[in-house]
Amino acid sequence: MKKIIKFVALMLTACLIFTGCNETDTGEGQGSKVTGAVQNHDGSDPGTLKVYCFELGKADSFLIYNNEATIIIDAGERGQGKDILQYMENNDIKGIDMMFITHFDKDHVGGAAKLIGNTEVKEVYTPVYIKPSDDYDNFSEKVKEKKTPVIALKENTSFEAGGIKIDVNVAAKEIYEESPSNNSSLIIRVSYGETSFLFTGDAESIRLKEYIATKPEKCNVVKMPYHGNYTKFMGCLDEFLDLVQPEYAVITSSKEEKEADETKELIEKRGIKLFRTRKGSVLFESDGKDVKAVQMS
């Protein structure tokens, strides 16, 4: 049974566990159903949810925040943490409630040590599988220095914070023979009222098929797996897109390492609006019923 963790309770009980410009409106979303705007349990209004997709080349980082909570999924490469911190400063974001590292490749964990060292990060969540590297060592040393709780998720887990629901789907195996780091990726669904955002890390075919088998619900926005790669998926991208039916898709790619043309075609033939971070950062805003998007030039 999926383990449900309430964010407030988690703040009190978490312990250190560490192992080894165009604008478009959309229609209604497909997340958990509410009537009207998002409300907290006490009836207060947490405000507009913003999801900022950083332009970091072929690297991932997504800052998710409203008036009451801040969540980050991945932290880009080493040297890119400063860009995230600058955005936080510019937008008066004082700290991070939850950091999720989808997997330990350098383009997802590289900037994490900088963030942890320079702003308050209350908790970090990771997969079980560790990919040894200098970036991992820097991350490990910094969380120990700051006494930041790190929890390796071993089962599907849900969180709530500031009216935001986070559902984390974990890999079925602790280690895979093929692409063990990519296929350890946490797949994270963020829901806000009737709207939802799906983040797939660098999941390859094996991992994506696991997730497809859960029959995921539709979402408003999907971050395409593995930087828009096509050859790693053996046709399952079609099935994935047919299930989640997003209005928007985001690909994290660079001018030097672009997404596959085949992936772009799969997205566009379905009428999905495609954003590529190599063309600029992307900001999504949700009021709990509708999603708006703008790409920064």
Regions found by a protein language model. Give the residues of each.
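Short acidic-hydrophobic surface loop/beta-edge motif
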Residues: Q39-S44, I64, E155-G163, I188-V190
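Short acidic-glycine loop/turn motifs at beta-strand connectors
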Residues: N66-N67, Y192, E285-D290
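Divalent cation-coordinating acidic motifs and surrounding scaffolds
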Residues: P127
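Active-site-proximal loop/helix segments of hydrolase catalytic cores
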Residues: C53-S61, N67-A69, I73-N90, F100-G117, ...
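C-terminal motif of bacterial Sec signal peptides marking the signal peptidase cleavage site
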Residues: L16-G20
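N-terminal, intrinsically disordered, polar/charged segments of Gram-positive cell-envelope systems
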Residues: T24-C53
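Positively charged n-region of N-terminal signal peptides that target proteins for export
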Residues: M1-K6
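Binuclear metal-ion centers of metallo-dependent hydrolases, dominated by the metallo-beta-lactamase
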Residues: E23, G31, I130-N182, Y248, ...
